Structure formats: C-alpha cells, structure tokens
Amino acid sequence: MQHESPIIRRKSTRIYVGDVPIGDGAPIAVQSMTNTRTTDVAATVAQIRALEKVGADIVRVSVPTMDAAEAFKLIKQQVSVPLVADIHFDYRIALKVAEYGVDCLRINPGNIGNESRIRSVVDCARDMNIPIRIGVNGGSLEKEIQEKYTEPTAEALVESAMRHVDILDRLNFDQFKVSVKASDVFLAVGSYRLLAKQIDQPLHLGITEAGGARAGSVKSAVGLGMLLSEGIGDTLRISLAADPVEEIKVGFDILKSLRIRSRGINFIACPSCSRQEFDVINTVNALEERLEDVITPMDVSIIGCVVNGPGEAEVSHLGLAGSARKSAFYEDGKRQKERFDNDDLVDKLEAKIRAKASVLDKANRIDVENLED
C-alpha cells in the first residue's frame, strides 16, 4: 500500500511551465524530449501525444533553425502538454517561438551569445510571462571556463550557471530554473549539490547522454536517486538513447521507488526460482503491458510461492501468493476465499486490478470533495 516518503525536499521558488507548477513543493515534473525532426510536424506531434499518453508533464522540442520555429508554431497548435523550446546559438529563434506561445525557453550559456543577446531573450520572456531554463552541460561549457578548469568539474558547471543567474538577477528576472547536467554521475551529483546551496530557484535534474535504455536507466536511477533522496530536484528528464516514451516510464519508476510521486501500478514481483507455482515472469510482463493505461497509484504483489507471498500481499492493495494448482488472492492485505487457477491468472488479475483501480479512483474523488466542502 502507499507509504509517505521520508524525504524532506529542498525549498525553492515557484514558477509555472504552462499550467504545470514547478518548485515550492509542487509534484516533481517528469519530462522528455522529442527526437523527430521538428520540421516534420506530423511525426513530432505524434511523438508528443505518445509522451503525453504515458504521463509526460512537459515536453522539450529542439528548435535549431527558423524553419523549425515555423514548424513549432504548427506543433504547438496541435498538442496540449506544455512545450519547452530548446535554443542554441541563435537567440532570435527564442524570440520567434515566444511569439508562437512557447511555455518555456531553454538556453545554453555556453553558446547563446553575449549579455546583450540574453537581455533580448529575457525582456521578451518577461513581456510574455515565459519562464527560462538555464541549461548548463558539461560538454559545452564556455571557452574561458574550459580554459580555466581544463576539464569539466562541479565548480566549472556551477560557475557557468551562476554567471547567467547573475545576469538574470541584474535584469530583475526571477522566473527561471537551472540545470547542470553531465554524463558522469559523480560530476552531475556534485554539481547539483553545489548549486543547490547557492540559489533558491527550482532545479531540473538529469544525467545527460546517459546511454542506451538499460545502462542509461541504471545510471540515471543512481545519479538522480542520490539527489532526490537528499530532497534536491523539482523536474527531471531521463536522457536515453531509446524511445522517448521509455524516458517517462523510467522517470516515474524512479519517483515511485522513492515514494515521491506515484503514477500507475507498482508491481512487487519475485525474480522466481524453483519454488514458483506459476510463471511469474511472463505473468508480470503480460500485466505490465496490458495495464499501461492504468494511472491509479496502487501496489500489486505477484509472488510465486508461499515463502514471501503472503507477507508481501498483506501490505499491497492486491496480492497473489503462489501455491499448488491454485494461488491465494489478497485484497487490502486480507486473504480472500477466491483462489486463482495457475493456468489462467493474467485475465483474472487484470480484471481485479482494473476493478480495484476504479474503487480507488472513486474513493480519491470523494476525499477531494470532502476537503472542498
């Protein structure tokens, strides 16, 4: 069953990306980035909708050219999730997408240009009430910082970030968040820890260029898990060389593991051994695939034998403890009279899980109504 997280989050200011609150205790937002060509409007819209379907709170879109900016205008008209425009080199592109309703501007201090160009972007953002993300990356630091430190260090990344924080402060602009990403876990973690001590603005977390689906997920879970467990972080992106949809799933899994934010089913499943009375692995895989559309937070334990099965089931919303021929079924920690045939588990479990999700959703709605009264 759901348990409260013991994590005490870092205090930060509040900004809004579209209608999504960021910082000051708001739920940690999970975002991804499209990997289509932005000028391919149909493909980009389709990918954004796929990301939104699995729970993306925010989607970032690369806008490298003026042609891409014109495409962004069309994309923005066809989706509802807030969009961040990723801007490098040409500050004029930021000004253009601002006209087209962008929800946030991401600029890279290492290549956006001199202070006068930043001032132009900030003035535009202020006039149109658009927040900015200062996005520092260990692979694209300013030349003078590279020369000063000779290699990326936490101090180098934070100095780059603080240069631009100071510019925004001088321009009296406080609607921004900051990221200091690196592909090395310790470098990224050290950079965020250092930055968290120096500013009050929201922090966007990420291990950049983390790798493929498996290795990148592990690296991100380790790095972001360290920071999140310390209360650091207000938004996150899992950077994978994989389908962006997987980034959202992994992001929510990390938050779910730390009890920070839950979306969908938390399956508690044994790795299986010779004691299993049914095929645990295929059962869990089938249920995960079938139930991707369920967003209700709930714990479901699927354990193949009676050693740990009853204990896990007693602390889950629903649970299955394997036994010969027919397995024991639990609801809200209590064993039910009904038993499930081990050769016909998936359909029955799916039906039970969907029914339980409906009950929990109704209870949550009643709770909210009572609070409003």
Swiss-Prot record:
GO molecular function, one term: 4-hydroxy-3-methylbut-2-en-1-yl diphosphate synthase activity (ferredoxin)
Transmembrane segments: none
Pathway assigned in UniProt: Isoprenoid biosynthesis; isopentenyl diphosphate biosynthesis via DXP pathway; isopentenyl diphosphate from 1-deoxy-D-xylulose 5-phosphate: step 5/6
Alphabetical keyword list: 4Fe-4S, Iron, Iron-sulfur, Isoprene biosynthesis, Metal-binding, Oxidoreductase
Residues reported in the UniProt entry to bind [4Fe-4S] cluster: C270, C273, C305, E312
Reactions mediated catalytically: (2E)-4-hydroxy-3-methylbut-2-enyl diphosphate + oxidized [flavodoxin] + H2O + 2 H(+) = 2-C-methyl-D-erythritol 2,4-cyclic diphosphate + reduced [flavodoxin]
EC id: 1.17.7.3
Cofactor binding notes: Binds 1 [4Fe-4S] cluster.
GO biological process, alphabetically ordered: isopentenyl diphosphate biosynthetic process, methylerythritol 4-phosphate pathway; terpenoid biosynthetic process
Cofactor: [4Fe-4S] cluster
Organism superkingdom: Bacteria
InterPro entries: Dihydropteroate_synth-like_sf, IspG_bac, IspG_bac-typ, NO2/SO3_Rdtase_4Fe4S_sf
Any Pfam family: GcpE
Function: Converts 2C-methyl-D-erythritol 2,4-cyclodiphosphate (ME-2,4cPP) into 1-hydroxy-2-methyl-2-(E)-butenyl 4-diphosphate.
Family in the record: Belongs to the IspG family.
Protein name: 4-hydroxy-3-methylbut-2-en-1-yl diphosphate synthase (flavodoxin)
Protein source organism: Vibrio atlanticus (strain LGP32)
Lineage: Bacteria, Pseudomonadati, Pseudomonadota, Gammaproteobacteria, Vibrionales
Gene: ispG
